[in-house]
Amino acid sequence: MIKFQANYALEENKIDCLLNKEIKGLHNFEENKIIICTENAKRKTNYRNEKQRPNKDNFKTELAIRKALRHESTHAIQKCNNNKTVGDIKNLEDKLHPSKRRALKFSTSRFSGTYAKEVEAYILEDKAKKVKKMLKKYCL
């Protein structure tokens, strides 16, 4: 477990990941915890170790884990911002890729995230520098 300055813990492959093998990460609001489900990400992206796939990288797996970390970090930022979104959701909504719209539907139907917070998190999971800047601004 890793703790960072905003009194958050970062954990990996907890029971929550086993309970839902579709998720790559989650944010526990009550316990200030971000959980990254690396085993789920590996399975969903056909991860292969070096013996199974020499000279091939696992770019898709690495990307999925980074996106999950940025997505869940966005929820931490929202919590630091009095449980509100940071950006203008109406402007962000139009930028959602169809695959992210499907993921958004899944997230809002299966988890407690509100539509606006999930839209923001899905948009920002592709914007590492912006997430880093907002973490510093709202949480540190």
Which residue stretches match the model-derived regions?
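Solvent-exposed, acidic/flexible segments
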Residues: N58-R70, K79, T114-E118
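Short pre-active-site segment immediately N-terminal to the catalytic Zn-binding motif
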Residues: N40-A68
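Structural recognition of the beta-strand scaffold that forms the well-ordered cores
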Residues: I35-I36, A76-Q78, I123
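Catalytic Zn2+-binding segment of zinc metalloproteases
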Residues: E72-I89
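Predominantly extracellular/secreted Zn2+-dependent metalloproteases
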Residues: M1-E39, K105
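Long, contiguous secondary-structure blocks with strong helical propensity
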Residues: M1-A9, P54-K60, S73
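Metalloprotease/metallohydrolase-associated module, dominated by Zn2+-dependent proteases
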Residues: D88-L140
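Non-transmembrane alpha-helical segments in soluble domains
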Residues: R66, R70, T74, Y122-D126
